[in-house]
Design a protein with these regions (language model features):
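Alpha-helical structural segments
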Residues: 33-44, 48-49, 62, 79-102, ...
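C-terminal peripheral helix-coil segments that are non-catalytic and often amphipathic
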Residues: 1-22, 155-164, 181-223
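Helix-loop "lid/cap" segments that line or gate small-molecule binding pockets
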Residues: 115-122, 129-140
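Short hydrophobic/aromatic patch on the recognition helix
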Residues: 63-74
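Short, well-structured alpha-helical segments
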Residues: 111, 173-184
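Short amphipathic helical patch at the helix-1/turn junction of helix-turn-helix
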Residues: 50-51, 71
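Basic, helix-initiating cap at the start of DNA-binding domains
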Residues: 2-49, 56-62, 79-82
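Amphipathic alpha-helical packing segments from all-alpha helical-bundle domains
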Residues: 93, 97-98, 123-129, 141-167, ...
Length: 223
């Protein structure tokens, strides 16, 4: 009678531990991952090298992809730069991450909004990189015109969402749109100033004063 020796138990255990096949990444996910790498590389180069240094070749090297792969996703440098503007300004949209809970009391809501907007947009290296893009693309009339059109759209969307978040300003201030414009302008100016050495005291004083200004704009004026 033929005797078949059983396999050792450790061998069977090892077979049980054979890893499952890796889950396949979909084509959509691969595209999104590659575009994410390209966008991050471009923003980093804009921040470190400025607009002139953010060439397609440099961006491809930074993202560790071929120039052909980059151009498959973004046909031209202008197309990539336009996408960067959308990326940087996304938190300012109605669905963005800067808007506080409208149920909060006005002073707390103003403070929360200022902190969110500063942390998620205006103090970030990406926002500083955006200014390298804005100023650097001036000689390219087509790109500058497109970016300016996006800026107008973002500005108006911000103003509308700001006043929806702080309806007290519309109710009690004689120039609510002016308040929204002033707040946005203050953020932008302070964001650009972050390119230089700003002390913590100066920064906190700005943020606190801006939050107080928003809260005061929504209060009934004393007679």
């Amino acid at each position: 009678m033929l005797y078949i020796k059983p396999l050792p138990s450790f061998f069977l255990t090892a077979m049980d531990r054979t890893p499952h096949r890796r889950q396949r990444i979909s084509q959509t996910e691969r595209v999104e991952n590659t575009q994410r790498k390209l966008i991050d590389a471009a923003l980093q180069l804009l921040h470190e090298e400025g607009f002139k240094g953010a060439t397609l070749q440099a961006i491809a090297r930074k993202a560790q992809v071929s120039l052909g792969a980059l151009q498959h996703h973004f046909k031209t440098r202008d197309a990539l730069m336009e996408r960067l503007v959308q990326e940087i300004m996304e938190p300012l949209s109605a669905q963005g991450s800067i808007w506080p809970d409208r149920a909060l009391p006005l002073p707390e809501r103003a403070h929360d909004f200022v902190q969110r907007a500063w942390k998620n947009v205006f103090c970030t290296p990406h926002y500083q990189a955006a200014w390298s893009l804005f100023l650097g693309c001036k000689p390219s009339s087509a790109l500058f015109a497109h970016i300016n059109a996006q800026r107008v759209q973002v500005d108006h969307g911000f103003y509308a969402q700001f006043l929806q978040t702080f309806p007290e300003i519309t109710d009690h201030h004689p120039h609510p749109q002016g308040v929204a414009i002033t707040v946005f302008a203050a953020f932008r100016g302070a964001g650009v100033l972050e390119l230089f050495d700003v002390t913590t005291t100066e920064r906190e004083a700005f943020l606190g004063t801006l939050a107080d200004t928003i809260a005061q704009a929504g209060q009934i004026a004393s007679t």
